Amino acid sequence: MSLEFSPPFNEVTQNLNETIEFEKELSLAELIEFFGLKYGEKFTDLVWEKGNKGVFSKYLSIIINGRSYQHDKFLETKLKDGDQIVFIYIYFGG
């Protein structure tokens, strides 16, 4: 599985890209938990709305295989070998 980290995620991971392999399929929630353990609280603070784990940050978009979507069971989305995942923050302003 290949991952891309846009700012500010790449500041936490110290990488723009990462390739990882797992022995079995895993859910998006498990992937986020994996990165939380690997990169610490700074990573999870970017994912979740402040003080509300389980609610994505309003700035976060996770793109899986070129599609950005969120639905009630988004965290249960199964990821597999060959998937491309992008963690991106959407900023607006002038």
Tell what function each PLM region has.
Residues 1-93:
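Ubiquitin-like/PB1-type beta-grasp interaction modules and other compact soluble beta-rich domains
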